UniProtKB/Swiss-Prot annotation:
Gene behind the chain: nirC
Post-translational modification: Binds 1 heme c group covalently per subunit.
One Gene Ontology cellular component: periplasmic space
Protein's cellular compartments: Periplasm
Function recorded in the entry: Monoheme c-type cytochrome.
Keywords: Electron transport, Heme, Iron, Metal-binding, Periplasm, Signal, Transport
Source organism phylogeny: Bacteria, Pseudomonadati, Pseudomonadota, Gammaproteobacteria, Pseudomonadales
Name the UniProt record assigns to this protein: Cytochrome c55X
InterPro entries assigned to the protein according to its UniProt record, in alphabetical order: Cyt_c-like_dom, Cyt_c-like_dom_sf
Pfam families per record: Cytochrome_CBB3
Chief localisation class: periplasm
Length: 119
């Protein structure tokens, strides 16, 4: 039994749209760019000063939870990046999307997970 021509046309269009979107949208992690050295210094300062004001000057916790590698272990990177960018509603955690790009937030999260930012 053959499908009606309208169904085949719609299915064909849906397939082409899916393929186009697959190649037009970068895969997570492939488009990430590391900030340049100047921006990295700014991000380190922001992390230690602004984030540290709630997460503790040593990032071991305070008003907000600890941001140590041990505390972040097992948490999905994408979830941590989303928290940085979007904040946490009903908590003191503000959204930083107005000041940070997704690459900036990803770079910060990666540094925290690896323990590469120490006060």
């Amino acid at each position: 039994m053959n499908a009606p021509p309208d169904f085949r046309r719609a299915a064909s269009h849906a397939l082409w749209l899916a393929l186009a979107l697959t190649f037009a949208c970068p895969l997570p992690g492939l488009a990430d760019e590391h900030p340049d050295a100047r921006r990295q210094a700014q991000l380190r300062h922001l992390l230690l000063q602004d984030c540290g004001s709630c997460h503790g000057l040593r990032l071991t916790g305070g008003l907000g939870p600890a941001l140590t590698p041990e505390a972040l272990r097992g948490k999905p990177r994408e979830s941590l990046v989303a928290t940085v960018l979007m904040g946490r509603p009903q908590t003191p955690m503000p959204p930083w999307a107005g000041l940070l790009s997704e690459d900036d937030a990803g770079w910060l999260v990666d540094r925290l997970i690896e323990g590469e930012i120490a006060p």
